[in-house]
């Protein structure tokens, strides 16, 4: 049974085009201004609050994001992070009045629900990866940690996972062990959004 409607265009939900504009590429630099890491993230507010994986930012002196239309914007401050679940919330110095942002899902998808992963792309394509929620475990209060029937490629870590109605519920995370061909994981986007530390800017 193939659950991978990989890069299928036919069934792309109508919200995909707009939602993909919220996904960006992240580049972090070390103190010698050499590239440290590259990855993905996405906006969750129109004024530039975004989510990604904390691993990307470890040891970084500065970071920039590259939007789907090629605009480069600086990361201004880390707003919160969780090392164990590898999430980070940060503010981007946006270049316009506002950016396209994803709406956080109010209701967590249940086991068996169809879900979509939106990759970062500079092309105007409607590519996505379809999968299903295998299970959802509760973590730290009312948040969820998801196991998904979905194959994850390396460059998809921290891409947004969407419900069928186009709301973001999770950040894609690396799978490890034998199940990597069929299974991946996701941390609750609302958990990432709840992270708060006293504002640290990269200049500090």
Name what the model sees in each region.
Residues 11-17, 60, 97-99, 168-204:
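C-terminal cap/linker of serine protease catalytic domains
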Residues 17-18, 32, 79-85, 133-146:
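Gly/Ser-enriched beta-turn/beta-hairpin loop segments
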Residues 24-26, 41, 48, 52, ...:
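Terminal peptide-recognition signature
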Residues 11-12, 28-47, 53, 71-74, ...:
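A conserved glycine-rich beta-strand in the N-terminal activation segment of trypsin-fold
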Residues 152-172:
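Catalytic nucleophile loop of clan PA
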Residues 45-127, 142-145, 155:
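Conserved active-site neighborhood of the chymotrypsin/trypsin-like protease fold
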Residues 44, 78-81, 136, 164, ...:
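Residue-level recognition of beta-strand microenvironments
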Residues 1-6:
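Bacterial N-terminal signal peptides
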């Amino acid at each position: 049974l193939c659950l991978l409607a990989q890069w299928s265009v036919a069934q792309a939900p109508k919200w995909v085009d707009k939602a993909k504009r919220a996904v960006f590429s992240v580049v972090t630099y070390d103190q010698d201004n050499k590239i440290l890491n590259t990855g993905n993230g996405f906006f969750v507010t129109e004024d530039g609050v975004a989510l990604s994986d904390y691993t990307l930012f470890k040891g970084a002196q500065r970071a920039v994001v590259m939007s789907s239309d090629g605009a480069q914007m600086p990361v201004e401050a880390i707003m919160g992070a969780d090392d164990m679940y590898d999430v980070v919330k940060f503010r981007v110095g946006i270049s316009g009045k506002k950016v396209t942002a994803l709406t956080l899902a109010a209701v967590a998808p249940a086991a068996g629900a169809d879900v979509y992963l939106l990759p970062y792309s500079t092309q105007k394509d409607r590519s996505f990866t379809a999968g299903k929620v295998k299970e959802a475990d509760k973590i730290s209060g009312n948040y969820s940690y998801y196991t998904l029937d979905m194959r994850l490629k390396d460059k998809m870590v921290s891409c947004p996972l969407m419900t069928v109605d186009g709301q973001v519920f999770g950040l894609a995370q690396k799978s490890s062990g034998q199940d990597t061909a069929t299974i991946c994981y996701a941390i609750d986007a609302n958990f990432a959004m709840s992270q708060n530390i006293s504002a640290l800017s990269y200049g500090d």
